[in-house]
Every structure is written in C-alpha cells, then in structure tokens.
C-alpha cells in the first residue's frame, strides 16, 4: 500500500477526551480510524463524542461535508496499527507507559508509519529515545475539543526528520487543522505556556479585587479573544 493511501487510514491508541476527539476529527474528514481502547465503556465514550461532533458541525455549517471515514475497534495494538499511515498515542501522561506502547506499535507497524503523541508537555526527545526508528516520531499537541479547534502544535525531537514534520503538516491540513511547527523543544510547548501566564495574572486580578471572574471572562470573549 502506498504512503498516500496509508494516510487515509490511521490508528488511535487510547480513547479518552483527546483520543476520542482525534477519532471524531478524522472520521468527519473522511479518514478511516482503527481504535485500540481496552478500557471499560470505550466504545460508548467514543460514540458519544462522535455524536457531539455531528451536532457541532451541523450547527456550524450547512455546506455538504465529506463522506465520513470508517471506524473499527480492535482487540490488540497489532491489529490496530496494521496498514496505517499514522498512529496517534493518547494514553496517560507517564513516560514509561508511553514508551511501552511505542515498543508494541513499532513491533507491528510498517517502517514508514508515522508515530505521534498527543502529550501536552512531555519532550519528544524523551519519548522517542527508545524507538528503533525515532526519525518518524513527533508530538502533535491538539486542543479540546479536538474535533472543533483547528490548532495543533507539531514538535519534533532530537531525531525527528524534516520529512516526518512535512508529512505531519499535510495530514493535519487535510483534516482542516492549522498546524504550527514549534522550532525548539520546550516544556508545555507554546500555547499552554501562554494560557498559564494568563491564568496566573487572572488569579492576581481576582485576588486583589480588580475584577470578577465573570468580568474577566467577558474581557477575553469580547476583547482579544476575538482577534
């Protein structure tokens, strides 16, 4: 199967809030998704997210949408990552857990398959250090709800190739996202660092009685949040 055809088929390992959001985003844009989510009620959770995405898209636009991709729940990582162009890992934020998952992914996926993590802050160089082919690994950090918010931060590690970054950008653009390549590794990347700065300042403003939480919310919603 060619690389371009394989990128019409992706795999998601993990189906929490972010994982399910990725699934909905790809399905709604005509990409087939294999899912490995061994936790209880995983299918119910994913289907609920798909329903939420359907409602949201229907309210946002009346333009005819793409034919939806197919969804398949698999019983093993081996079956999940077979013949796909991209594997998205969205498991708990622990390096050891993620690296164990990557080892199993690499054991069963093609050498050309891209592997990405949805981590919100772990450095990609640390995550990729035990991979056999670390050049195909990167971080793709989205924002919740993934099926609505277009921004995704692409962060390469020490061994990530330029080809991998370029392919990742094309995948996200294909599903209507706005990828930003972070030029250097930094903890928490860029967007969350900005949010943290706003959060810290907001706490001080409220504590000192400068404004209320409702007023702060209005300042963001009706001011710079609209830019």
Please place each PLM-identified region on the residue numbering.
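A non-catalytic, amphipathic alpha-helix used as a structural packing/dimerization or gating element
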Residues: 44-52, 97, 163-174, 215-218, ...
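Rossmann-like NAD(P)-binding element
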Residues: 40-41, 57-114, 122
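Structural motif
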Residues: 13, 36, 74, 90, ...
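Rossmann-fold dinucleotide-binding core
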Residues: 117-184, 188
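Helical "substrate-binding/catalytic lid" subdomain
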Residues: 185-227
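NAD(P)+-binding Rossmann beta1-loop-alpha1 motif at the extreme N-terminus of oxidoreductases
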Residues: 1-56
């Amino acid at each position: 199967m060619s690389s371009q055809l394989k990128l019409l088929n992706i795999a998601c390992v993990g189906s929490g809030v972010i994982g399910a959001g990725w699934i909905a985003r790809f399905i709604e844009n005509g990409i087939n998704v294999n899912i490995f989510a061994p936790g209880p009620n995983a299918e119910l959770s994913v289907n609920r997210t798909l329903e939420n995405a359907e409602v949201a898209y229907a309210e946002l636009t009346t333009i005819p949408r793409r034919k939806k991709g197919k969804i398949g729940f698999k019983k093993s990582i081996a079956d999940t990552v077979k013949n796909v162009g991209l594997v998205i890992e969205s498991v708990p934020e622990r390096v050891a857990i993620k690296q164990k998952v990557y080892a199993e992914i690499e054991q069963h996926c093609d050498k050309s398959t891209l592997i990405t993590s949805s981590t919100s802050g772990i450095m990609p160089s640390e995550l990729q250090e035990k991979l056999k082919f670390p050049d195909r690994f990167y971080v793709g950090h989205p924002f919740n709800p993934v099926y609505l918010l277009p921004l995704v931060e692409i962060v390469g590690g020490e061994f990530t190739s330029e080809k991998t970054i370029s392919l990742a950008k094309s995948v996200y653009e294909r599903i209507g996202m706005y990828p930003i390549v972070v030029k250097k590794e930094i903890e928490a990347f860029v967007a969350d660092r900005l949010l943290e700065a706003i959060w810290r300042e907001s706490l001080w403003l409220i504590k000192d009685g400068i404004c209320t939480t409702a007023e702060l919310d209005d300042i963001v919603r009706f001011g710079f949040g609209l830019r």
